[in-house]
Amino acid sequence: MVKAISSNLGYPRLGEKREWKRALEKFWNGAISEEELLAETKALRLHALKKQQDKGIDLIPVGDFSFYDQVLDTSVTFGIIPKRFQHDGGKVSLNTYFDIARGKSDAVASEMTKWFNTNYHYIVPELAEADPKVLDNRALYYYEEAKNELGIEGKPVLVGPVTYLKLGKGSDAESFEILLDKFIPAYIEILKELETAGATWVQIDEPYLATSFDKKEIALFEKVYKAFHDAVPNLKIELQTYFESLDYYEEVVNLPVAAVGIDFVHDHGDSIKALKAHGFPQNKYLAAGVIDGRNVWRSDLDAKLALLTDIAHYVAEDKLIVQPSNSLLHVPVTKLSEPDLDEVILGGLSFADQKLDEIAILTKALTEGAESVAAELNEAREAVKALNESSHRNNLEVQAAIANLENVRVDRELPFAERIKLQHEWLKLPLFPTTTIGSFPQSPEVRKTRADWLKGNITDAEYNAFIEKETARWIKIQEDLDIDVLVHGEFERTDMVEYFGQKLAGFQATKFGWVQSYGSRAVRPPLIYGDVAFTEEITVKESVYAQSLTKRPVKGMLTAPVTIINWSFVRDDVPESVVANQVGLALRKEVEALERNGIKVIQVDEPALREGLPLKQARWQKYLDDAVYSFKLTTASVQNDTQIHTHMCYSDFDDIIDTISALDADVISIETSRSHGEIISTFEEVTYDKEIGLGVYDIHSPRVPTVSEIQDNIRRALRAIDAKQFWINPDCGLKTRKEPETIAALQDMIKATKEVRAEYQVLEK
């Protein structure tokens, strides 16, 4: 027997039915007061803590809650507030907090980017002239709240100082250690206040440790955690890593902390190898992340128990902690909200609450013996077996098509330089052609009509008539704005991935499988539970209708395989590359159907390509090769005069520019406005031979850009990109924006474009 401890690393903020999102948006819209927002979110927070307590979790995280983002929380804790928000130096108000994330009329929002290789976004700290001081010990507040309200001796959670600073901008390698030295005393102040309040454990997240970095940077962690240990020697610090294995395992496990949290799920088997090769300090706790915190499939508890038993051989008898691989922020709350799912699929699922059950079962099995949870282990065993052996996962036609891939063409017939001439001949677009990325605002009326249709309150005919009316209205708006290449607006779609999941075999949508993407923005990733196959035309009807309304080209709009993979919960019984190729083959048929029906500009979005990169650079090439292959599998069969577009979201592109080119899309649009200078510098250093649009304004903020701001962005881009290659577009889709601000921003974009276009035409003469 092993005396094990159960733990959690973080819990979803959204609520079972997105109550958190609704509370935030009511506050932003002025429908509730700050006091009402605080009361609503406190009730959600305590409910989540009580559930974890009732499930028998020993170490319950507190302070993982946020009103927007945990990295932004760290910034406001230490007073790292950009000057443009005119902070007065005291505790940061909730309005200022939201302004940093969302922007306001006279101050643009802080940059937002992906949290490691997930679809969660964090607000990037602006570290120039940073002078950290503890303005608000949020961790202390949440610790005392849990203790006083529920009697929970919680485990406060902090973003570690090295990771926080590495995620920021405005400091270089030379100033990094100087900046770190400023933050260490501020963190110590937080830790001392927690210790004084009675905290026993503190979880400090340092996922940067799971990335690829120079070994000399280990000295940064040694400095930080020695200082922490010297200041609060009796406080048990759990140094938490996740999303990958540790390149410097020996150095990390010997840092002066009470516990080290290691990911045994997303580590490619490296963590157990390192443990066996180097052992583990007997005076430390090993917090073993064995339950997948990023996916929704039920664990093979027999295999997990065997792994934990193996791990236990290398850890002191009372120092094994059982936990998820990472915070459960990345999965929905509970599968109990999905009673209508197929029984076999439902049985194979495990959302946040069920993962806590799995942790409790494994902890009890270690402590009291497997026989004490024999029924639970058998139930899990049968559920996993039923799903794996079901017809859902054994489509022989799809498997035969995958086996025949070597006979499928994945290259366009003509190279770009030749086919672009054919495209220009019929498109006849002006210099700096304008377009949008795909979606237009989904008004309350759009959402209500869709909800009524789903509930059966209106007929299919009534719903389709409404979608056509809205599409026609926005085609007219685009023509009036004088946009060159139009889109149909995607009013029939709830989400750019979920919509395709509803039409392809092997996918299953959920009702309440929501996860946070950024701020109050929630997404509902489909479940890819089985073999993926094309069953019906997905986008043709809406695209053809939109094209019938205008002489201007209308883009067909699809989502590419890797983004569908990265924004779905993907089956874990086959390699993701196999699933991506199944999706690619299915979408290839949709692309061909669009072309066959007269749609000659087809956008296949790959916004999540960069975010899915493995954290270890040694694994990059295979991932990128697989991504290029599945994209070309989707697009290569079109005629030479059909123009393929693609779109990518927030990313650092300098290290994958060759991959972007290898996709062989005729036009790429990139979301860049919050980090415009960095993206432009990439194109100053490389020669990109295809056509490209760099987003000229930020759509994640309700703020309407000025014409001069857009022109500045255009002119900066044209320093690095040939005018004949350059397209002009917003950063991203406009679904989440309101109609007045959308039209106003597009008017400014078109005005800015025409003025710059005129300047260039004069120069050409």
From Swiss-Prot:
Under the heading CDD domains, the entry gives: CIMS_C_terminal_like, CIMS_N_terminal_like
Q: Record-annotated residues binding L-homocysteine?
A: 437-439, 490, 605
Write down the chemical reaction(s) this protein catalyses: 5-methyltetrahydropteroyltri-L-glutamate + L-homocysteine = tetrahydropteroyltri-L-glutamate + L-methionine
Can you tell me which residues form the catalytic site?
Answer: 700
Chain positions recorded as 5-methyltetrahydropteroyltri-L-glutamate binding sites? 18-21, 114, 567, 611
Q: How is the cofactor bound?
A: Binds 1 zinc ion per subunit.
Q: Which residues bind L-methionine?
A: 437-439, 490, 605
- Gene Ontology molecular function terms on file: 5-methyltetrahydropteroyltriglutamate-homocysteine S-methyltransferase activity; zinc ion binding
The cofactor required is: Zn(2+)
Ordered alphabetically, the record's keywords are:
Amino-acid biosynthesis, Metal-binding, Methionine biosynthesis, Methyltransferase, Repeat, Transferase, Zinc
Concerning InterPro entries, the annotation shows: Cbl-indep_Met_Synth_N, Cobalamin-indep_Met_synthase, Met_Synth_C/arc, UROD/MetE-like_sf
UniProt-listed GO biological process terms: methionine biosynthetic process; methylation
A Pfam entry, by short name: Meth_synt_1
Pathway in which this enzyme or protein is active: Amino-acid biosynthesis; L-methionine biosynthesis via de novo pathway; L-methionine from L-homocysteine (MetE route): step 1/1
Positions bound to Zn(2+): 647, 649, 671, 732
Tell me its EC number(s), please.
Answer: 2.1.1.14
Its biological function? Catalyzes the transfer of a methyl group from 5-methyltetrahydrofolate to homocysteine resulting in methionine formation.
Recorded family membership: Belongs to the vitamin-B12 independent methionine synthase family.
Q: What is this protein called?
A: 5-methyltetrahydropteroyltriglutamate--homocysteine methyltransferase
Q: Which gene encodes it?
A: metE
